[in-house]
Swiss-Prot record:
Keyword annotations from UniProtKB, A to Z: Mitochondrion, Ribonucleoprotein, Ribosomal protein
Gene encoding the protein: mrps19
Residue ranges that the Swiss-Prot or TrEMBL entry lists as coiled coil: none
InterPro entries with a match to the protein in the record: Ribosomal_uS19, Ribosomal_uS19_CS, Ribosomal_uS19_SF
BP GO annotations: translation
Protein name: Small ribosomal subunit protein uS19m
One Pfam family linked to the record: Ribosomal_S19
Source organism (scientific name): Dictyostelium citrinum (Slime mold)
Lineage: Eukaryota, Amoebozoa, Evosea, Eumycetozoa, Dictyostelia
Gene3D superfamilies from the UniProt entry: 30s Ribosomal Protein S19, Chain A (3.30.860.10)
An annotated GO cellular component: ribosome
Localization per Swiss-Prot or TrEMBL: Mitochondrion
Amino acid sequence: MVRSRWKGIYVAKELQNYNTVSNPTIVTTERSSVIIPYYLSKTIYVYNGRKYVGVKITEKSLGRKLGEYVLTKKVEKYKASKKVKKK
């Protein structure tokens, strides 16, 4: 479902009050926060449940959510099974 227009966009309070002058690295666990123009050309470190992953903010990512750029599940790689030769 789409968020109601009258509510506005959601940005976490920890991101709204962040002062990049005193601390240049932005660290958050809020994957549901919307990327706003204030963060353009900055790197935000988002927690994926195991570690913090850096997300570089560009113009294409404005208006999208931080969680879209951080995978929370490991991509499974299957190994090819070895075929046994019969003699």
